[in-house]
């Protein structure tokens, strides 16, 4: 453990005694909702029929595992969260939950989610969930986040894996389509978070987090956003080309992909002043809608096909 973690375990301003709402906040509900949604798509699109109880158990365990990873991330990053304006009110830096309480909470949920998924669903799904939690907490949070501007690129794998975990829960195997679902989220992550970091660069710099705009500058970040978007858009169309998705998905992926590309070009061109901030915010917001529409269409096609 590094010195930052040592500080994060120091006595806090209060004795903890957090409310249920504080512990829910530790789970990062917004992130958890995305994990649940993308995992549900993986579960429904898997070729095997899944008993409703098994399906519910799988989604529950994946959600709890994601929440556990979020809690452990907040435990480790308490010193960073105390410095950054957008995270200062989180339960640990605000003193409502102590670091030790958050650590115990996160470890308990992580163990529960992996063991239950492995025993009640299948070992492959449990192993993939364990790897996902490990990658997010140890590889990304404890190592990459503070050491390299590629933190989001490499660390993004953990956020991309839930559809594969759910696919494995449903089928007991991994297929090409599950890999494509992971790849779409993986290559979506850098443009999404770099757009955010363009207008939050001062916050990251103050906390000592080497996000790309801090280390390489905003112009290089804009170029990387455009390059990743140029790769992401055709990748998102690949399920149609491979016969895994239908016309509806192709139309949605094509139209929204064009929107992503135009907004990325706008970010690349708008380099100074309020226009640059507005362009980055628009891309950040639209990227969320983009991913949602892609996966919602895949989900809808699978449900219609199963009728």
Swiss-Prot record:
Pfam families recorded: UbiA
Flavoprotein found in the keyword field: no
The EC number(s) this enzyme carries: 2.5.1.141
InterPro entries: Protohaem_IX_farnesylTrfase, UbiA_prenyltransferase, UbiA_prenylTrfase_CS, UbiA_sf
Protein's membrane topology: Multi-pass membrane protein
Predominant localisation class: membrane
Cystine residue pairs: none
Domain of life of the organism encoding this protein: Bacteria
Catalytically driven reaction(s): heme b + (2E,6E)-farnesyl diphosphate + H2O = Fe(II)-heme o + diphosphate
GO molecular function, one term: protoheme IX farnesyltransferase activity
Localization in the cell: Cell inner membrane
GO terms under biological process: heme O biosynthetic process
Parts of the chain that traverse the membrane: 24-44, 52-72, 115-135, 152-172, 179-199, 224-244, 245-265, 284-304
Task performed by this protein: Converts heme B (protoheme IX) to heme O by substitution of the vinyl group on carbon 2 of heme B porphyrin ring with a hydroxyethyl farnesyl side group.
Other observations noted: Carbon 2 of the heme B porphyrin ring is defined according to the Fischer nomenclature.
Name of this protein: Protoheme IX farnesyltransferase
Organism for this UniProt entry: Azorhizobium caulinodans (strain ATCC 43989 / DSM 5975 / JCM 20966 / LMG 6465 / NBRC 14845 / NCIMB 13405 / ORS 571)
Gene transcribed to yield this protein: ctaB
């Amino acid at each position: 453990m590094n010195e930052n973690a040592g500080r994060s375990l120091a006595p806090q301003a209060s004795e903890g005694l957090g409310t249920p709402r504080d512990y829910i906040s530790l789970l990062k509900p917004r992130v958890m909702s995305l994990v649940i949604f993308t995992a549900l798509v993986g579960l429904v699109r898997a070729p095997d029929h899944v008993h409703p109880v098994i399906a519910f158990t799988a989604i529950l365990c994946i959600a709890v595992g994601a929440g556990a990873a979020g809690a452990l991330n907040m435990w480790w990053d308490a010193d960073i969260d105390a410095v950054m304006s957008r995270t200062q009110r989180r339960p640990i830096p605000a003193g409502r939950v102590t670091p030790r309480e958050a650590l115990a909470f996160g470890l308990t949920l992580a163990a529960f989610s992996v063991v239950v998924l492995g025993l009640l669903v299948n070992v492959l799904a449990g192993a993939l969930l364990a790897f996902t939690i490990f990658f997010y907490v140890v590889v990304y949070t404890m190592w990459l986040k503070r050491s390299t501007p590629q933190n989001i690129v490499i660390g993004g794998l953990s956020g991309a894996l839930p559809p594969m975990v759910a696919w494995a829960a449903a089928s007991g195997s991994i297929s090409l389509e599950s890999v494509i679902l992971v790849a779409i989220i993986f290559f979506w992550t850098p443009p999404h978070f770099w757009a955010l970091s363009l207008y939050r660069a001062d916050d990251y710099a103050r906390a000592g987090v080497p996000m790309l705009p801090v280390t390489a500058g905003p112009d290089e970040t804009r170029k990387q956003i455009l390059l990743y978007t140029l790769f992401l858009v055709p990748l998102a169309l690949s399920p149609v080309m491979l016969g895994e998705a239908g016309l509806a998905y192709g139309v949605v992926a094509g139209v929204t992909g064009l929107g992503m590309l135009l907004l990325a070009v706008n970010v690349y061109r708008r380099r100074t002043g309020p226009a640059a901030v507005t362009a980055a915010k628009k891309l950040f917001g639209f990227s969320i809608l983009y991913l949602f529409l892609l996966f919602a269409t895949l989900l809808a096609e699978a449900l219609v096909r199963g009728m």
